C-alpha cells in the first residue's frame, strides 16, 4: 500500500499526557505509516499507560514499534539481573517498576516483557528512491546495517552524529535535542542526513515530537 504519510514519533518516557497531545494532532489512520522510536517508559508518571498504548497500537499493520535502551534496561532487570540490571532503577526505572508492582500481575508483566523482547531494533524503508532507517539511538559509522551491534543501535551518541557519512536518511531519538543545542526542544536535522527526534519529553519544558518524513511537517505536544 502507498501511504499518504510516513510518521515517526520520538521518545515518550512515561509522559502519556504529552503523547496524547501530539497523537491527537496527527490525524492517524490506516493510510498513515507510523514508526515509534522506543523509550516508552521511565522518568514520567504514566509509564504503564505509555507501554500499554504501544502494545495496542503496534498490533496494527501500519505501525512499527522499535525497542529503546530503556526497554532494554527493563529486560535486563527482569530477565538477567546482575550488573546489567543495576542501571535501570537509577535511570528512571524506579518509577516504571513502582507502577508495574502496583498494577500488574505476573502474567501481565510477562506479556509486557515479551512485547519488549519482540521489538525490532531498526526499520528500513525505501521511498521515492531514498533510503530511510529508523532506529532508537543511531548507527555505528562505516558499518553495514546488517552488521550493526545492539549496543550501538540502542546507546550510541556522539560517534554517530559526528561520524555518520551514509547515504541513507536516519531518523532517531535517544539524544535529547537540548543536549545538542541548549534549550532547543525541537527536532534537529543535521547536515549528514540525520534527524534527531528526542525533544526532551521527560524534561520540564520538553515535548514529544512527530515528523512526516515525506513532507517534513512536524507536530509537537502542548
Regions found by a protein language model. Give the residues of each.
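Cytochrome P450 core scaffold surrounding the K-helix E-X-X-R motif
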Residues: 142-148
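Conserved beta-sheet core of the metallophosphoesterase superfamily
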Residues: 149-221
Amino acid at each position: 500500500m502507498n501511504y499518504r504519510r510516513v510518521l515517526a514519533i520520538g521518545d515518550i518516557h512515561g509522559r502519556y499526557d504529552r503523547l496524547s497531545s501530539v497523537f491527537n494532532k496527527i490525524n492517524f489512520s490506516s493510510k498513515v505509516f507510523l514508526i515509534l522510536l522506543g523509550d516508552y517508559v521511565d522518568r514520567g508518571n504514566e509509564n504503564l499507560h505509555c507501554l500499554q498504548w504501544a502494545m495496542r497500537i503496534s498490533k496494527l499493520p501500519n505501525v512499527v514499534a522499535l525497542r529503546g535502551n530503556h526497554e532494554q534496561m527493563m529486560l535486563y532487570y527482569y530477565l538477567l539481573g546482575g550488573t546489567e540490571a543495576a542501571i535501570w532503577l537509577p535511570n528512571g526505572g524506579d518509577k516504571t517498576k513502582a507502577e508495574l508492582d502496583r498494577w500488574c500481575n505476573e502474567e501481565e508483566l510477562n506479556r509486557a516483557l515479551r512485547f519488549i523482547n519482540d521489538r525490532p531494533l531498526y526499520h528500513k524503508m525505501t521511498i521515492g528512491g531514498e533510503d530511510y532507517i529508523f532506529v532508537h539511538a543511531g548507527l555505528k559509522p562505516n558499518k553495514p546495517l546488517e552488521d550493526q551491534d545492539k549496543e550501538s543501535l540502542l546507546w550510541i551518541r556522539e560517534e554517530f552524529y559526528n561520524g555518520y557519512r551514509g547515504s541513507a536518511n536516519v531518523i532517531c531519538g535517544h539524544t535529547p535535542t537540548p543536549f545538542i543545542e541548549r534549550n532547543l526542544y525541537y527536532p534537529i536535522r543535521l547536515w549528514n542526513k540525520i534527524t534527531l527526534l528526542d525533544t526532551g519529553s521527560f524534561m520540564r519544558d520538553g515535548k514529544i515530537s512527530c515528523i512526516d518524513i515525506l513532507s517534513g511537517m512536524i507536530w509537537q505536544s502542548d
